[in-house]
Amino acid sequence: SGHRRLGQRAMANLKCKNFFAASGPPSVLLSGLAEGADQLVAEIALESSWRVEAILPMPLAEYEKDFTYAAALARFRALLARCHRIIEIPLASAVDRDIHTISTPRDGVTREQQYRNLGRYLVEYTQTMLLLWDGDVSAPKPGGTAEVKLMCDAALARQDDPECHGVRRVIH
């Protein structure tokens, strides 16, 4: 998880390459493939012979509307084509099934809820969470990296519970 607009991209790139080099045999990366941090990490994972599974926060056609630049959308599609598996998180049950209304709050569920559900999925099914962000949790946005960090903290606090699985380590 991380910022869409990455500062210090060269440092983030180097730290991610070091992470994958030190991680032992290739494994699986789960990623939303959003522009910025997600795409950077997915590219490095693929270069490191890891499998990448795309976990999309909503149906593909709707998710593609969130890419603000043509180059980012093209990069997303190229990465998606290299993914081992693609999972689309279903729309929250309170969202009108007319996909065009997902951006409008309806019964308390918004587009941000779909990103929050992506964060929950990643925290539940990931053992190590990589966070590429500024570290500011003072004003978490729904579904943003700060909220994902708080979800990770809650999961780590429960890690001694045999019923709890998911994140066991967070790297910032």
Residues of each region from the PLM?
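Acidic/glycine-enriched connector segments
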Residues: 1-172
